[in-house]
Amino acid sequence: MKAIIVLLMVVTSNADRICTGITSSNSPHVVKTATQGEVNVTGVIPLTTTPTKSHFANLKGTKTRGKLCPNCLNCTDLDVALARPMCMGTIPSAKASILHEVRPVTSGCFPIMHDRTKIIQLPNLLRGYENIRLSTHNVINAERAPGGPYRLGTSGSCPNVTSRSGFFATMAWAVPRDNKTATNPLTVEVPYICTKGEDQITVWGFHSDSKTQMKNLYGDSNPQKFTSSANGVTTHYVSQIGDFPNQTEDGGLPQSGRIVVDYMVQKPGKSGTIVYQRGVLLPQKVWCASGRSKVIKGSLPLIGEADCLHEKYGGLNKSKPYYTGEHAKAIGNCPIWVKTPLKLANGTKYRPPAKLLKER
């Protein structure tokens, strides 16, 4: 019986047989795995997209601010931040803001020496707040400030709704009425006047001109000293006296003088101080700001809505979880940047089709 069984097994093993296995069509999909390197699979889902540049848009689900004051026509953001006459309007609240003025921008009314201070940063500082409003009252009585009485200087390049001459609402140009003499440093306290626990942004500065003009206006042609202090930050300045070339700002009148403008941030309940001599621009209306707004570099106008705002690509809608291309700051519901495309294998590992084998 055992011999017969062995014989049967030999006969069976020599017979033709079919080997079966997993079969599939030829696969063009290759994925790179962490453990097996490149592997052919039967199917993949792309996880990345490469965006193309588009216009900027409003961020879905939130308010987006382009210009600080959209209704202030023919006004730069610096005009609005300094409260230039004819550039005073409501700044809308926003959770996201577009930094669209990428170069230092001058403001009308008076030539500003931008390189002396951080004043060109003021519009960006304001953009970083969700809620921004200009106080209805002046922070100090400039006409009766120490060293006065003063008359408040104006510029023919700053017309307002009632007069052909004016000045920034955030500052008062303090020109001595009768006591046009040199003075030792004077100190004025700047109180906190915001009413809702906001940060108070107080703008101030000083005026410089030729020796002749300084003598005529203030009774002192020497360089003047100025200091501001608030929130633990102290800044010192010395005015520059000289014959500046006439300069015209925003189609205004030619002016030989220059102003240096700065600001200080006062926290709730905290006062600040300004120490000054002749030519001071005393603070008046202040900005009261609260909340946080995300800021991103971009351009105007804002057209439509988008899931994400990207500095290089503009408005993006999130069609894939990842993107390739230029890596830059982005805000909103944004895809994640990756260096190379990612794919999700949604099929099996590819195996060659099974073959009919004939054993001999």
Curated annotation (Swiss-Prot):
Q: Name one GO molecular function term.
A: host cell surface receptor binding
Q: Does the keyword Transit peptide apply?
A: no
Q: Where in the cell is it found?
A: Virion membrane; Host apical cell membrane
Pfam families registered for this protein in UniProt: Hemagglutinin
Q: Please tell me one Gene Ontology term that the record gives under cellular component.
A: virion membrane
Q: What membrane topology does the annotation report for this chain?
A: Single-pass type I membrane protein
Glycosylated residues are N40, N74, N160, N179, N246, N317, N346
- Gene3D superfamilies referenced in this protein's UniProt entry, alphabetically: 3.90.209.20, Hemagglutinin Chain A, Domain 2 (2.10.77.10)
Tell me, which GO biological process terms does this entry list?
A: fusion of virus membrane with host endosome membrane; fusion of virus membrane with host plasma membrane; symbiont entry into host cell; virion attachment to host cell
Q: Mind listing the UniProt keywords for this protein, alphabetically?
A: Disulfide bond, Fusion of virus membrane with host endosomal membrane, Fusion of virus membrane with host membrane, Glycoprotein, Hemagglutinin, Host cell membrane, Host membrane, Host-virus interaction, Lipoprotein, Membrane, Palmitate, Signal, Transmembrane, Viral attachment to host cell, Viral envelope protein, Viral penetration into host cytoplasm, Virion, Virus entry into host cell
The source's superkingdom equals Viruses
For this protein, the record's InterPro entries field holds: Capsid_hemagglutn, Hemagglutn_HA1_a/b_dom_sf, Hemagglutn_influenz_A/B
The signal peptide here is: 1-15
- Record text on subunit structure and interactions: Homotrimer of disulfide-linked HA1-HA2.
Similarity section: Belongs to the influenza viruses hemagglutinin family.
Additional facts recorded: Major glycoprotein, comprises over 80% of the envelope proteins present in virus particle.
Q: What is the protein name for this chain?
A: Hemagglutinin
Identify the species of origin.
Influenza B virus (strain B/Hong Kong/9/1989)
